[in-house]
Amino acid sequence: GAGYIGAHVVRLLRQRGDRVVVVDDLSTSNAARIGDTPLVRLDVATDEARSVLSNLMVDEDVTAVIHFSARKQVGESVARPTWYYQQNIGGMANVLAAMEDAGVDQMIFSSSAAVYGIPTAEVVTEDMAGHPINPYGETKLIGEWMMADCERAWDLKWIGLRYFNVAGAGWPDLADPAIMNLIPMVLDRIERGESAKIFGTDYDTPDGTCVRDYIHVLDLAGAHIAALDVLAEGRQPDHHTYNVGTGLGTSVREIIDGLRRVIGWDFPVE
């Protein structure tokens, strides 16, 4: 809730008058991002998390949960698979169990396009999931399975949003600080007086660089709120999982050229 995407959702919810409580261990986030929004500092993957969360949900009259908490670096997930399962699946299990204990039956889940692995189609549809190629993507797919199981067991109402590549900032103080992502990485190298670096120029794409679907973080935040409203109003969604992207691909070189135009400087690229 205090991370890059979560903080945008929190701000939009509060702007429209919703009451919000954030649970975050602040290991990869910053409390300053959520201002005076009530914050409970907690790692949801710990043994005590279930009871703490269920008591909090009862005390705060929580009606819905938006679950962002997860480790999300693909390379790290390959190097530390059991830790990723403990963090992402263990945390998800604690949150769902706490919701059942507290009688909270609405969840919006931060899923990922990583559930598709390496698709053979140019445009992926929601029914093509099931072939992740790394532990991170596997944990997201399992998270969707867990919600479906809880729907069958105790009538959980849920929507999973499969993010593509998130970029931008709705407000300057909520910009993405994670230099593992393309745009912050390029800006960080420029700030340090280094050349931007392109890794891979022989992809089967028009300019040889990797192509990804990028979505602005405010559009993604709005998708969370729209999904939340569907569940709050008791409407039956057409699907449980939704791709959240633009459907348009942008290459690494196009991103760098765009940054050059915006900055007004033809910075060096390797």
Report the location of each language-model feature.
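Short-chain dehydrogenase/reductase
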Residues: 85, 133-141, 176-184, 213-214, ...
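Short, flexible, glycine-rich and Lys/Arg-enriched loop motifs at helix boundaries
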Residues: 31, 160, 165-182, 192-212
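Basic phosphate/pyrophosphate-binding loop/patch that engages nucleotide-derived ligands
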Residues: 100, 149-152, 182-191
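C-terminal substrate-binding subdomain of Rossmann-fold SDR/epimerase-dehydratase oxidoreductases
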Residues: 190-270
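N-terminal Rossmann-like NAD(P)+-binding domain of SDR-like oxidoreductases, especially those catalyzing
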Residues: 1-166
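Short, amphipathic alpha-helical "lid/cap" segments that border enzyme active or binding sites
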Residues: 50, 54, 183, 217-225
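Short capping/connector residues at structural and topological boundaries
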Residues: 31, 79, 121, 129, ...
